[in-house]
Curated annotation (Swiss-Prot):
<keyword id="KW-1003">Cell membrane</keyword>
<keyword id="KW-1133">Transmembrane helix</keyword>
<feature type="topological domain" description="Cytoplasmic">
    <location>
        <begin position="251"/>
        <end position="386"/>
    </location>
</feature>
<feature type="topological domain" description="Extracellular">
    <location>
        <begin position="122"/>
        <end position="136"/>
    </location>
</feature>
<feature type="transmembrane region" description="Helical; Name=3">
    <location>
        <begin position="137"/>
        <end position="158"/>
    </location>
</feature>
<dbReference type="GO" id="GO:0071880">
    <property type="term" value="P:adenylate cyclase-activating adrenergic receptor signaling pathway"/>
</dbReference>
<dbReference type="InterPro" id="IPR000276">
    <property type="entry name" value="GPCR_Rhodpsn"/>
</dbReference>
<feature type="compositionally biased region" description="Low complexity">
    <location>
        <begin position="339"/>
        <end position="353"/>
    </location>
</feature>
<dbReference type="GO" id="GO:0043410">
    <property type="term" value="P:positive regulation of MAPK cascade"/>
</dbReference>
<feature type="disulfide bond">
    <location>
        <begin position="135"/>
        <end position="215"/>
    </location>
</feature>
<feature type="topological domain" description="Extracellular">
    <location>
        <begin position="201"/>
        <end position="228"/>
    </location>
</feature>
<feature type="topological domain" description="Cytoplasmic">
    <location>
        <begin position="159"/>
        <end position="177"/>
    </location>
</feature>
<keyword id="KW-0325">Glycoprotein</keyword>
<dbReference type="GO" id="GO:0004930">
    <property type="term" value="F:G protein-coupled receptor activity"/>
</dbReference>
<keyword id="KW-0472">Membrane</keyword>
<feature type="glycosylation site" description="N-linked (GlcNAc...) asparagine">
    <location>
        <position position="45"/>
    </location>
</feature>
<keyword id="KW-0675">Receptor</keyword>
Length: 466
């Protein structure tokens, strides 16, 4: 960073401390209001200078920056702690698929605890004033945690892809397999982060810290190509390809139709093929109630199927993803419970008689063609929106920084604003703030767990088994 943007860092060759508030107006007859409004001569360490509104603006900007960065750090810590706590506390979230989510939350929490605070000090002071040793530690932690966070997204996308495209995957998705993926993610991130500490640094690394007060990861061109390719560009390509294949597979299955079978015929006297009529008003109410319940269940299951296939955090992901291979159910309902004696146990239809006037109790398909097509379009839009949020947030947060990281060592004459470089860096960090939101907001299990953690509520799940 350019260290000349705030008073006290204009001359890096002198060991001059940053002036305190009392030094600003030592030996002068003007106040803060005078300095802001009119400007006046003040004495700082025996040197007369002109305090203007620019100096105060810099001070206000520094204060605002401190508050904003502190809020980002706090939000990142709280969000990822909530995710980890929810998985630890809630038994229905303790499944192998959510181990990847927990590991991602740990990586993002490390970004918030190890990387962001020192980065905030760097931004507020407008220069690295903590020495080469802490710079090495900070850059290594930065690369380790940020790379692990990004590579976890690849592991999550891979897990989803296997779950959607391989019907047998849920049977081999065990702890050993998921833990192997987690170890590979952290191992790759560790290799990239330790390479500069093992000697892969550019010649100006130390001079940049001591003379220019800039703490940057190694600007060696070969290392930057290796690091950016292995921790962003290749993972980005993999994520885009996998999510596109997931979307294509899910859309193809959503659009798959099966013509409903013809309703079972009834005899002239209103009896079903089994010869057992449904005669009473009580029976009619029973049939109607069972149909409405099953219709709700059917619609909910179809609506959630694609979302469960696309999202990693469904507590019931194993059972829900299974349903992706099933055709949408548009036939008449099935009664699988005990029925009154006068109700036919036939699965497809039954007939209700009221006195001499028979009534067909065969329930039509839950949706007509037009309604079905509308529902399919709605589910496809939801799938596209979900994937757009997941991939869009990742690309939006990290792409500017990694373009800059690759351009800087290649183009030695290119000048990138320090403010722009800081913004791109913190935009990448902000992805660790968004991850706990993006990867849990679509899961009702996580939402209920967060509510219980926040409000101590223990709401019974309103899921009915049929």
């Amino acid at each position: 960073m350019n260290a000349s943007r705030l008073p006290g860092f204009n001359d890096t060759s002198q060991d001059q401390p940053y002036p305190t508030s009392s030094e600003w107006f030592d030996g002068s007859n003007c106040s803060w209001v005078d300095a802001v409004s009119w400007g006046c001569n003040v004495t700082i360490n025996g040197t007369s200078t002109n305090a203007t509104s620019t100096d105060v603006t810099s001070f206000v900007l520094m204060a605002v920056t401190s508050v904003v960065l502190a809020l980002i750090i706090l939000a990142t810590i709280v969000g990822n702690v909530f995710v980890i706590a929810a998985i630890i506390i809630e038994r229905n979230l303790q499944n192998v698929a959510n181990y990847l989510v927990a590991s991602l939350a740990v990586a993002d929490l490390m970004v918030a605890c190890l990387v962001m605070p020192l980065g905030a000090v760097y931004e507020v002071s407008q220069g690295w004033i903590l020495g080469p040793e802490l710079c090495d530690m900070w850059t290594s932690s930065d690369v380790l945690c940020s790379s692990a966070s990004i590579l976890h997204l690849v592991a999550i996308a891979t897990d989803r892809y296997w779950a959607v495209t391989d019907v047998d995957y849920i049977h081999i998705r065990n702890e050993k397999r998921i833990f192997t993926m987690i170890v590979l993610v952290w191992g790759a991130a560790l290799v990239v982060s330790l390479a500069p500490q093992l000697g892969w640094k550019d010649p100006d690394y130390l001079a940049r810290i001591t003379q220019q007060q800039k703490c940057l990861v190694s600007q060696d061109l070969a290392y930057q190509i290796f690091a950016t390719m292995s921790t962003f560009y290749v993972p980005l390509a993999v994520i885009l390809i996998l999510y596109w294949k997931i979307f294509q597979t899910a859309r193809r299955r959503i659009r798959r139709r099966r013509d409903p079978p013809p309703p079972r015929p009834t005899s002239a006297d209103g009896a079903t093929p089994s010869g057992r009529p449904v005669q009473s008003a009580r029976d009619r109410r029973f049939v109607k109630k069972r149909f409405l319940n099953l219709k709700k269940c059917n619609q909910r299951t179809r609506a959630e199927t694609l979302a469960a296939a696309l999202l990693l955090t469904e507590g019931q992901s194993t059972s829900t993803v299974d349903t992706l291979d099933e055709e949408p159910r548009t036939t008449a309902f099935t009664i699988n419970e005990k029925v009154p004696p006068s109700v036919s146990p036939e699965k497809s239809s039954s007939t209700v008689t009221n006195g001499s006037k028979p009534e067909r109790a065969i329930v039509p398909a839950p949706t007509h063609r037009e309604k079905k097509e509308s529902l399919e379009a709605k589910r496809e839009r939801k799938a596209a929106k979900t994937l757009a949020i997941i991939t869009g947030a990742f690309v939006f947060c990290w792409l500017p920084f990694f373009i800059m990281a690759l351009v800087m060592p290649i183009c030695q004459t290119c000048v990138i604003s320090d403010y722009l470089a800081s913004f791109f860096l913190w935009l990448g960090y902000f992805n660790s703030t968004l991850n706990p939101v993006i990867y849990t907001i679509f899961s009702p299990d996580f939402r209920q767990a967060f509510a219980r953690i926040l409000f101590g509520t223990h709401r019974r799940r309103r899921y009915k088994k049929f």
